[in-house]
């Protein structure tokens, strides 16, 4: 009888929406000065003084953006915030608030939604964000998480995709391809599990790549480092859909071409090992993989010396005046066209 009552309490259909929202959000505190009024009213009230307001929204859909057979719900909640924070950072702005809406089918119980919010809470703590609103509703099928992130920036310092100039240097943070290879490992083990549910794989040697896929981090340190060095990028974008796609976005928005060098693309040794195991060229993983959430940006040539010996950055190439000529120069000097073969949700 007690077990049946516990199950009923865990069933979302037995919980009023107002009670559910209070239960999920009671431990969230407002800490940013710009958050005047948060959860609990019809709308949030924000005050950004004389700053420009930056807004980004991303939706994560089960079966399209994530697979719950290997994605822990807490990690999913965390990642849903990170992908939005990364967009705000790509504008050179400081993220400060999020609104989270979740639609879940009746196969999800209260403890599952609470696990997602545990991840959201952890991300809000990591990136100093206030949860100021959102919605929770039912879904006919699966799970959907929609997040809106707000931030602010001095109007003289926000950065777009369209400001690159001829002669500018192309720079990237971190390393690339790890998230994609982590996904390959997880998909392989899922296939093995479907054939043999008793299999217990040792994934310790894949920790780096799996972590890059399941629990990525947005590069708030990069924006701070650039500011500390008094460098304002001429254009910037985050790498969510693969290096090749983002290069094409920057070049088309700035109305020029970008040339990069294959041997300059940063790829972690852990990623290279997994690529070798799967028979995948590491360069292909970096160019087309996606979900690295590193920052790709251009700077004026005069600033290149400031970052030349900084381990946070890697100079990939430069911008050229000629249009429609994005290319990669290989290690043997071959010129290869860079096409947009990154991740596309409508071509999955």
Model-derived regions: residue spans:
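Short, compositionally biased
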Residues: 182-199, 203
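Glycine-rich anion-binding loops of enzyme active sites
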Residues: 50, 60, 95-189, 318
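Glycine-/charge-enriched secondary-structure boundary and capping motifs
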Residues: 2-19, 23-29, 107-130, 138-145, ...
């Amino acid at each position: 009888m007690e077990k049946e009552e516990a199950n009923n309490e865990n069933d979302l259909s037995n919980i009023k929406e107002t009670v559910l929202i209070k239960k999920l959000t009671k431990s969230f505190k407002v800490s940013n000065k710009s958050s005047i009024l948060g959860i609990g009213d019809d709308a949030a009230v924000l005050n950004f003084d004389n700053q420009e307001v930056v807004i980004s929204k991303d939706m994560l859909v089960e079966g399209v953006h994530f697979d719950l057979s290997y994605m822990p719900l807490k990690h999913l909640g965390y990642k849903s915030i990170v992908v939005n924070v990364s967009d705000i950072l790509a504008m050179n702005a400081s993220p400060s608030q999020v609104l989270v809406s979740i639609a879940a089918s009746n196969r999800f119980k209260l403890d599952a939604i609470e696990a997602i919010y545990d991840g959201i809470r952890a991300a809000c703590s990591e990136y100093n964000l206030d949860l100021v609103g959102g919605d929770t509703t039912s879904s006919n099928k699966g799970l959907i998480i929609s997040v809106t992130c707000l931030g602010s920036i001095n109007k003289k310092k926000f950065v777009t995709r369209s400001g690159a100039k001829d002669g500018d240097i192309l720079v990237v943070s971190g390393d690339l391809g790890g998230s994609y290879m982590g996904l390959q490992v997880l998909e392989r083990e899922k296939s093995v599990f479907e054939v043999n549910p008793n299999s217990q794989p040792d994934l310790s040697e894949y920790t780096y790549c799996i972590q890059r896929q399941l629990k990525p981090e947005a590069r708030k340190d990069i924006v701070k480092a650039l500011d500390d060095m008094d460098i304002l990028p001429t254009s910037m974008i985050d790498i969510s859909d693969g290096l090749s796609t983002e290069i094409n976005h920057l070049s088309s928005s700035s109305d020029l071409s970008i040339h990069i060098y294959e041997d300059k693309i940063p790829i972690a040794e852990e990623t290279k090992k997994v690529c070798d195991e799967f028979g995948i060229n590491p360069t292909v993983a970096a160019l087309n993989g996606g979900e690295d959430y590193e920052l790709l940006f251009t700077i004026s040539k005069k600033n290149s010396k400031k970052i030349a010996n900084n381990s946070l950055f890697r100079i990939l190439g430069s911008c050229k005046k000629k249009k429609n000529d994005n290319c990669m120069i290989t290690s043997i000097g071959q010129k290869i066209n860079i096409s947009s073969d990154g991740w596309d949700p409508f071509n999955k």
